[in-house]
């Protein structure tokens, strides 16, 4: 039979905006001068454009071992936050044009990429992975200040993050063991204190976010 080619319209396109920060950031140490500055601005603008053309729906679904990872869960709320993080990224890049330290620039790129990943994650494992990228990028941003105070603050933040991350992971594991599903949905709370394992999982997940 004849091959059929489907024309993909703008409303059907999904490119994860974090790609422009996480993968795009890898070229930062290679580039120099104005070329680097222009490149960073272009990457941030492309990420913003990716959010503009993102259709509502579920995208980027991959099977990993026995888990289903969903990288793109797009609705009105997630799109609003994606816009916010992209705009923050653009402003931050323009503000940091004078920064010469490639490590600091790379950490900033990874922070925004992690934030976008968290915003669009459709399952808790994907959310946790991007949350870790976001959190560790924050630590390196603090450490790149290279003062005695920033080193102390960075270690303190790292301690809190590891604690919060373990609590969050415990909640995710309990949820998965109970339901066999990592999809992000409602949190079944019954009052302020968990009364069963299902609400305990939700409680730990929320506490993990708060601690972080």
Task: Show where each model-derived region lies.
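Residues within alpha-helical transmembrane segments of multi-pass membrane proteins, especially transporters
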Residues: 23, 27, 80, 84, ...
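Alpha-helical multi-pass transmembrane bundles of energy-transducing inner-membrane proteins
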Residues: 106-110, 114-194
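Alpha-helix capping and helix-loop boundary segments enriched in small/acidic/polar residues
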Residues: 14, 104, 146, 194, ...
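Hydrophobic alpha-helical segments
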Residues: 22, 86-89, 93, 111, ...
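Transmembrane helix-loop-helix hairpins at membrane boundaries of multipass inner-membrane proteins
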Residues: 2, 6-106, 181-186
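Short helix-boundary/re-entrant hairpin motifs in multi-pass inner-membrane proteins
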Residues: 63-66, 153, 200-212
């Amino acid at each position: 039979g004849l091959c059929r080619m489907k024309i993909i319209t703008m409303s059907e396109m999904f490119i994860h905006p974090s790609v422009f920060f996480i993968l795009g950031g890898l070229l930062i140490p290679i580039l120099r001068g104005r070329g680097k500055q222009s490149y960073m601005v272009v990457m941030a603008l492309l990420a913003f454009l990716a959010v503009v053309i993102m259709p509502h729906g579920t995208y980027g679904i991959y099977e990993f071992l026995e888990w289903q990872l969903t990288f793109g869960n797009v609705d009105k709320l997630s799109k609003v936050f994606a816009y916010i993080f992209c705009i923050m990224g653009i402003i931050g890049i323009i503000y940091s044009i004078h920064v010469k330290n490639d490590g600091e620039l790379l950490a900033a790129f990874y922070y925004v990429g992690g934030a976008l990943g968290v915003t669009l994650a459709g399952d808790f494992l994907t959310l946790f992975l991007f949350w870790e990228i976001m959190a560790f990028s924050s630590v390196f941003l603090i450490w790149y200040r290279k003062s005695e105070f920033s080193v102390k603050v960075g270690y303190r933040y790292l301690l809190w993050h590891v604690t919060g991350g373990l609590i969050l992971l415990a909640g995710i594991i309990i949820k998965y063991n109970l339901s066999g599903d990592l999809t992000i949905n409602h949190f079944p709370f019954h009052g302020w204190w968990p009364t069963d394992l299902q609400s305990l999982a939700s409680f730990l997940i929320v506490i993990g976010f708060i601690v972080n």
